Structure formats: C-alpha cells, structure tokens
Amino acid sequence: MPKIVDHDERRAEVLSAARRVIARDGLDAATTRAIAKEAGYSNGVLAHYFTDKDEILLSALRQSHQRIRERLARKVEGVTGLAALRELLLDNLPLDAERTQETRLEVSFWSRSLASERLADVQRSEAAELRAAVRDLLAQAKAAGELSTDQNLDDVTEHLLALVDGLSLHLLLYPDRLRRVDLERILLQHLDNLR
C-alpha cells in the first residue's frame, strides 16, 4: 500500500526547517542541503515542493509573517486604541525565544532585500501593513482621548516603528548591554509619553 503524504504538512515542515536554519546560522547558510537536513528529508523532497531555493526562502518569510499576524490577531481581539497598540508593538519586540527567532529571520532578510526586488516587495508590503495598523490604532487612541500629543500621527507612527526596529536590532547585536526587560520598559515609557 503506498504511503499517503500530506503535501501541505510536508511543505510546512520544510519552511519551518528553513526558518530555523536562517535564524540559527544566517541566510547564507540556508542552502537546500542544510534545509533538507534540518527537516530530515532529502534534497529531492525539497525539489518536489519548491522550484528553487529562493522560493523556499521567500515562502519561509511569508509563513513567518503569517504566523505573526495570526498571533497578534489573537492578542488584540476585543482590544482597541492604546491597549491594542501596546500589544502590537510589544509583539514586534524579541521578548521571548519565538519572537527572537522571528526577529533574527527578519533581520537576515533585510540585506538580501536590498539586492532582490522580489524580497523587497514582500518587505515593503509587510511594512506598509504594520505601518497602517500602528497609524490606525494611534488614531483610535486619539479619538478616545487616550493620547495628548499634538504631533502628526504619521510622524509618531514612524518614530514608534523605528524605535521597535532599533531596540530589536540592538538586543540581537548587543545582548550584554540590553535585556528583554529593558526593551519593554523603554517602549512602554515612549507610549506613556504620548498620553
């Protein structure tokens, strides 16, 4: 009797393996051989599900973004304004092992995106979606009287996103200087200053 294979499950396993290799060893180390080994499959199995390495990498990035969106949707369900903004921004910081892996993955793709229009398009799309969500939550908070700032909300949005990116990068690069609790404290101070 032939073995029944769940193709979606196998693709997901390969993408999960790709994310682990990238987060642990970097994007350059994410060869098809390394990804196949991490997943426990042969290179031939990867070729059956993906046309090339770039498709695996791009799919791994998209899958990571989708997982983040799903997790965030659960966290902010029924929450609006400043409380939802707080959750959204904290969720984008590497405050636990899962989010640290996601941040390492994301940062690994940043430099590659400078040379790949295809990757850059994915990054721009995701950044625009996040930017719009932050801007909308700021507008909700302002309308609800939760913010006292007179600053342009587009500028506040850029400031908050730059803060999250900077704090995340600093934690990855200088773990001896910053702790996760420091990131949370600094971000929450900035949000409190908007009240």
Q: Where do the protein language model's features map onto the residues?
A:
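N-terminal intrinsically disordered/low-complexity leader segments
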Residues: 1-9, 20
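Helix-turn-helix
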Residues: 13, 17-59
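Conserved amphipathic alpha-helical interaction elements at protein-protein interfaces in regulatory
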Residues: 20, 24, 52, 74, ...
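Residues in soluble alpha-helical coiled-coils and helical-bundle/repeat scaffolds
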Residues: 51-55, 76-80, 97, 101, ...
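Hydrophobic alpha-helical connector segments
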Residues: 59, 70-103, 153-160
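Hydrophobic/aromatic-rich alpha-helical bundle segments in the mid-to-C-terminal region
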Residues: 100, 118-124, 128, 142-194
